């Protein structure tokens, strides 16, 4: 996500910006991700800016004049009007909420993966030379049918994986020198993100059949299941980090090689008095910093200057503080005491190979050095250790590039600044020091390891073949496809590598929540720390000041995941990568940016005058500028996708183009941020084969929200509202999807907002328009969703007004007799009969043919009479073994007989599918939906057949809604049967308001028994007034007040947080406009007709019905299956298990004196058992007639649970004997 996007009146670009645009477009067309654009699609908004001035027509004074935006010249008279413009234009397309997923995935497709293949060196095996060509992608199609189109709806219906084939050219040179080019080599099949550049939903341009128009995309379809890749937060690399270490200071620098993805951590520590040490890579012992500088060929004066500790005036050192002076003296002392051959002295600290490098670690080290330099076999010899030290000093200290001595000096400077108070310690929890591995980097991590594994397996397989054809071997290899799909299906993100086992990220890919539309959007914006949930790091879980505008403070789960699993704020996202080469090319452009001296050592800025600053690009020191103000101003204009961070006190300017930076929208009224250069046109997305365009951004066609995007690190050093940037309203950037729709969430306590953020995801709503075409295992749908009369702006922006997940009952706040209403609500039965809160639950049963071996298979068919289960009903099966609703005779029996047993009215319509035969067909428990026979080998090797048909369980009864017979991705028969069960509200069901007033249904009263007012208005819901003092949900009452006025005036009211200066005055004005004299109403009792002694507050208030329903949890049994080992009833309602009697139930029955009831629960109805016990020795005997221990014949039967008998046997096996007295 980039920060360079401006509002539709983009800033006029100066000559420097225009020349940058021209140079980059002409000179670097093939540079990966040269634009660095992501969220703000530059091609959408840059035409206005770049066409305003050209290099030939530029005004000579334009470089000196400030950049003023068109919006600020024409429309914006003051900041209040600018905020109004921002808010009025903030209605975003649904795809904007998942833009961080889509653009990250597109960047991986067009830039990262082609670069991996291009870096792969030609492979030589048996005289053949194999070279991979340009990567391109084919549109999604069914396996083995490239002429057909595979849409997301088809993938869901057929349980297929929605993927695209990544193909390339393959050039093979045989031993005779003959070159053959194969135009299509399939490397792998990459799962395609819905809504990405290669998805049919983007290439077709209009909603496809079976797709929801409001579907934001951003997820994958793996074996018919929708799965989302959750981004992971990690520490930032390639920057020095200073921490307090006891009485001293510790500086860490973790560098990463972007091509090989290898990392190295080096540390420097000091106490500013006697110790100044540094750790070399792969050497566990710390060595003096002065010794390292001398080994790098630097003098003492150069070392002091590189560390920014001071400047030399003759033989004296001029330092900024006492700490700088003491560290400079310590550094010069270490340099002077170092031997003449510092490399030999460092070699003494290299441990012996036998004590450090095991065979496994040695192999891993050899593989790690394979691409850079070889390591001598004998590390014990003196010469090999010195060569090893030289090799480490040359290129192993800082893998990201740059001069090792300068970066070592940078680390020492940071420690000196922190010790003297000039600088500050690094805050580990600050988002400025965090990066996010989004969907693209996570998949690229897998592809990088799998591509190497793909080549290694090719070399291994080719070496074993006589008549070798390299193309055939590579084409038949499925290692990349299978491993990718396995990682997506399981969520375990890892690649098998040589050496010690690597870290496995668990839960990266998750099944997408589809309970309602809000839960879907919220899950797509989820983010998590790459740590264990059981970690005891409290500070990581707490809120941080840097989270403002980036992470939602409310939306986090309870329990062990609190603070680890988070949600992005509404205006936040992640940046894409702008390559370091592109940034350096722009900095060097023409005469360069103001005052920039390329290659100048950073010591000139750190130890020189105060008017200069060092410049680094993603952690690589590249020069010095003598005009920091002008440099920063021009850099922000020419590099809109790069963060320009100027630390004035430290005299450092950081140009950050790395991917994964936290960015968020801010206002740019002064036009500080330029629109940059035009991106080259995106590839034609309607082509059958899509060639990668490395410098293009295929997601530029997505609509862009207004504002500019600034990263957390830049916001930490700039001053918002002080001439640089301005913050949008807090209501637009503070919260995420589920919490932003809470009405007046600034008028309630914080825990209530957190509760509603989680309860809103459990509410039953309208998850998608294409519910009739979906075959989820369980899907809830509210029959009559209603829009609220009082809601926030986010409701319309998120689309919750069209995809609602609540209803709008008339609520009365009263005790209503108080019966069973401690924390519950009373519902109006007549309102429920009219459809209030009624919903439908869809359950899909899926079954497919399976053929594992010749004698191990499962076939969908009509089971023979001899195989059938006597307790099951096969009457509705057709000749093909699939339920057939057109069976007239069975249907007549079902409608007449089973309807009476189920006590349901004939011909009842419950919604769901088209009216027809299936609407009247009620499927009771025990009915076979799909006949299936298993074929296997018996104990004697004889073929066996067994009936494994799919039946309706006791808790899954419903109306037959739809039956589909299809073919899965393996070409086997796939049957899906969907049942529809109406769920009307009943006692025990959970309901909650949008302000987190949760309660169960305590009573359902008829309309005649409910109170009524003089106009005959009867409340639909009654809530206990005692629910308000402790929960303090003032926004509940505000919503009811404005709702009453909205009903009388026929309009809606805005409930956006932080928008009303005086809400009491606004309520009074609304009441005056609606003609309301008093908010309370005079009600009469429905049972007696008498007037109630007090006035009652009654008004419409939106409520949600949660998915926790009594009909889905109620369960009982008299007998059923038991566990084979313990002989206790199995657990689980779906398995017809028993009811658990836990410790609390046990003590409850004891306190009531119900000992017989307790005995019946834990013994008689559980694992009742009797054992023979000898009356002489008291031991359990294995015979009922006599005891083999003491030869006694006097035996008795003792009753005890079977699990207790197993426990006694286990104790006896370890020598502990149990005797009964």
UniProtKB/Swiss-Prot annotation:
The keyword rRNA processing does not apply. Residues 1-63, 673-701 are annotated as: Disordered. One of its GO terms (molecular function) is DNA binding. It holds the Pfam family RNA_pol_Rpb2_7. Transmembrane segments: none annotated. It catalyses: RNA(n) + a ribonucleoside 5'-triphosphate = RNA(n+1) + diphosphate. InterPro entries: DNA-dir_RNA_pol_su2, DNA-dir_RNAP_su2_dom, DNA-dir_RNAP_su2_hyb_sf, RNA_pol_bsu_CS, RNA_pol_bsu_protrusion, RNA_pol_Rpb2_2_sf, RNA_pol_Rpb2_3, RNA_pol_Rpb2_7. Residues 1-54, 692-701 have a biased composition (Low complexity). Keywords: DNA-directed RNA polymerase, Magnesium, Metal-binding, Nucleotidyltransferase, Transcription, Transferase, Zinc, Zinc-finger. It is an enzyme of class 2 (transferase). GO terms for biological process: DNA-templated transcription. Mg(2+) binds at residue 823. GO terms for cellular component: DNA-directed RNA polymerase complex. It comes from the Viruses. Its EC number is 2.7.7.6. Zn(2+) binds at residues 1174, 1177, 1187, 1190. A zinc finger (C4-type) spans 1174-1190. Component of the DNA-dependent RNA polymerase that catalyzes the transcription of DNA into RNA using the four ribonucleoside triphosphates as substrates. Second largest component of RNA polymerase II which synthesizes mRNA precursors and many functional non-coding RNAs. Proposed to contribute to the polymerase catalytic activity and forms the polymerase active center together with the largest subunit. Belongs to the RNA polymerase beta chain family. This is Putative DNA-directed RNA polymerase II subunit RPB2 homolog. It comes from Frog virus 3 (isolate Goorha) (FV-3).
